[in-house]
Amino acid sequence: IYSYDEKPGIQAIATTGKDLNPTTNCGTIKRDYEYKRLGTVSLLAAIDLLTGEAVPLVRDKHTSDDFIDFLKILNEKYPEGDIIRVILDNHTVHTSKKVKAFLATMPGRFIFIFTPKHGSWLNMIEGFFGKMTRQMLKGIRVSSKQELIDRIYKYLMR
């Protein structure tokens, strides 16, 4: 069973000046508030509720095609004939014509369990995204969008 969701709009932000080293009075790095935006990425991710394993996919957007690519990753992880259950929200992408057409090519392979409307907090991955935001994304500065993508994968694959 997987808990799945998207985290869109993760900003790649670069500093415009050098950070100041900590002083004896203040043990933290000082950083100018000015920054340069390098773009955004969307994280499509699931957590295996039995093992805790994260399955990430980082893209520029989160379209039906991106969701299908994510489902293909899950499909490759299990032998043919196994049923893959996915807990997810009611985002329109999850029930689009493209997704339905993809699912029709492998009947019974995926079972979607939708959270109630306004009940996203019931999906376990929401807590994981909150922890990731606090531990890794808060205050992050990168030199490129690709560096942000690499750091997201490194965080999730540890």
What function would you assign to each model-found segment?
Residues I1, R85-V86:
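Hydrophobic "anchor" residues on beta-strands that sit immediately upstream
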Residues G52-L57, F112, L137-G139:
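Short small-residue beta-strand/loop micro-motif enriched in glycine and branched aliphatics
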Residues H62-T63, V86-K97, P116-L122:
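Acidic, metal-coordinating catalytic cores used for nucleic-acid/nucleotide bond scission
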Residues D65-I84:
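Short, basic/hydrophobic alpha-helical segments
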Residues I125-E147, R151-K154, R158:
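Active-site proximal helix-loop segment of RNase H-like, two-metal nucleases, encompassing DDE(D)
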